[in-house]
C-alpha cells in the first residue's frame, strides 16, 4: 500500500495535478507558513483608573467592584449583559451609561482623549454635569477610565464595527460574523478592592505673629489642597482648589516680607491653614477646630479671631463672590473687609464684578456646602471667596478641571484684589486716607505671576485626591517646606477615621493594569472543530478507497500521454 501511495504521489508531482495537489498539500502549507499574530495585535496592556469608591457618614459612594474579566462591546451592541462596555468621552452620555447599568454590563471603560485641554467645551460642560450623578448612586459594576493610545483606539474601533454589524445584518450574516470575527477579552490584573485602614488626612498650619500685645486680633486664611473627580488618579483640581492654595501661598510670601520689618509689622496675627480632606466634608478643618478649640489652651483660634477667609476656586471668570452664612454687621472687621473688597475691585479692577452671596447652613445635609461653614458652626466669623455662583458647580468636582482651565492673568488679578483688600484692613489704610485706586503692592512687593504659575504647574502635575496623598509623600513635604520658608511654627495636623464609627472610609485598587486579549468567540471553536472533522473524514475516506483513487489517477495519466 505504501509503495502504491508513493507511486501515486510521484505521478501527481510529475503530472502537476494542481487540483489534487492543492487539496492534499494546502492544510500542511497553511500550518507551516501562517505567521502568528504580532504581540501588539494579540494583546495590549494599558493603565486604567477606577471610579471613586468611598464611604462618607456611613453612606457608600461610587463603584464597589474592581475585578474585570469579560469580553468587550461598545454601547451600540444590542446585548450588553456581562460585557465590558467601551465608551469614548466624545460619545459618552448619561443615557448610554444608564443603558449599560440597566443591562447588567460586566464593566464600563470610558476612554479619554490624550489632550484633555483640546476637548470641546460643550463636551466638558456635559461631563461635568454627569460626574456628580455617576457618584451619587452606588453601583456594583466596575467603572474604569483609560487614556487613549493608538492600540486602544484600534480596539475600540474594531469592537464598535463588530457591535454595529450585529445590529444591522441578517440572522445568517450575524451568525457568520459571530463565528469568524475577532473579539477582545478585557482583564484587570488587580484584586478586589479593600478598605484602607488607618489612613491619615493631613493638614498644614503656619503663622505670622503680629507686633504688640498678646491679645491681638487674628485673621485666618484657609484653603483646602485636595482635588476631587469621578476618578481619583485623574483628579488634578486646577481651579478647585489649586487656585485657592496658590493664592494662600502667595499671600504667605507677601505678608512674610511685610512682617519682616518693624515699620510694616502689623498688629494682627495671620494664621494660614492648608487643609486636607476638603472634598470629604472638610475633615481636616473639622479636626483642626476640635483640637484647637476643645483640646488645647494655646491656640490663636481661641483668642480674638477677626475673621476667617476661605479661598475656593478663584482661577477664572470675571466674577468674585463672597459666600457668607450670615451677612456681616456694620462696624465689624468682616464688614470692613467686605467693603475693602468692593472698593478695590471697583476702583483698581473695574472689569471684575464683585458681589456677596448669602446662604444659610443646612445642617440636615450630609455634606456642608462651603468650608467657611465649618467655622461658622463653631461661631467664628467666616466667609468663602470664589468665582462660582453656588457650591454645586461642576468644576468643584471634575476630572475636567485641568491646568488649562485656570487663566494665569485672572488668578494673578484675583490674588492682587485679595492682597490689596487684606492689607487695607490690616493697616487701616482707608481710614488713614489712602485713595482706593492707589495700589499697595508695587515694584518689588508686587504679586508675581511667574511664582503663581510655577506653583500651579506643580499642583497640577500630580493627582491630589485625598486617598492618594500620604502624610510622608513628596507633595505634603513640599507644601510644608514651602510654608516654612515664609511662616513660623509650621506643623502638620492629622485626621484618622474612628474604627467603630468612621466618618470616612477609603478603598484601594484605584489604579490598575488592564489587558486586552484578542480572542475568537466560542462558536468559532465549534466551527473549527466541524471543519477539522470534515477534513479528517475526507482523508479517512480517501485512504479507505485508495484503490479507486489510484485507478482514477492512472486513467487520467494514460489519457494525458495518449494526447
Curated annotation (Swiss-Prot):
Membrane-protein topology: Single-pass membrane protein
Predominant location category: endoplasmic reticulum
Superkingdom of origin organism: Eukaryota
Chain ranges passing through the membrane: 523-543
Topology feature Lumenal, residues: 43-522
Side Cytoplasmic, residues: 544-563
Glycosylation sites: 241, 428
Keywords: Endoplasmic reticulum, Glycoprotein, Membrane, Signal, Transmembrane, Transmembrane helix
GO function terms (MF aspect): ribosome binding
Pfam family membership, one: Peptidase_M28
GO cellular component: endoplasmic reticulum membrane; multi-pass translocon complex; protein-containing complex
N-terminal signal peptide: 1-42
GO biological process: multi-pass transmembrane protein insertion into ER membrane; protein stabilization; regulation of protein complex stability; regulation of protein-containing complex assembly; regulation of signal transduction
Subcellular location as annotated: Endoplasmic reticulum membrane
Assembly and oligomerization: Component of the back of Sec61 (BOS) complex, composed of NCLN/Nicalin, NOMO1 and TMEM147. The BOS complex is part of the multi-pass translocon (MPT) complex, composed of three subcomplexes, the GEL complex (composed of RAB5IF/OPTI and TMCO1), the BOS complex (composed of NCLN/Nicalin, NOMO1 and TMEM147) and the PAT complex (composed of WDR83OS/Asterix and CCDC47). The MPT complex associates with the SEC61 complex.
Task of the protein: Component of the multi-pass translocon (MPT) complex that mediates insertion of multi-pass membrane proteins into the lipid bilayer of membranes. The MPT complex takes over after the SEC61 complex: following membrane insertion of the first few transmembrane segments of proteins by the SEC61 complex, the MPT complex occludes the lateral gate of the SEC61 complex to promote insertion of subsequent transmembrane regions. May antagonize Nodal signaling and subsequent organization of axial structures during mesodermal patterning, via its interaction with NOMO.
Family statement drawn from the similarity comment of this UniProt entry: Belongs to the nicastrin family.
Protein name as it appears in the record: BOS complex subunit NCLN
Originating species: Rattus norvegicus
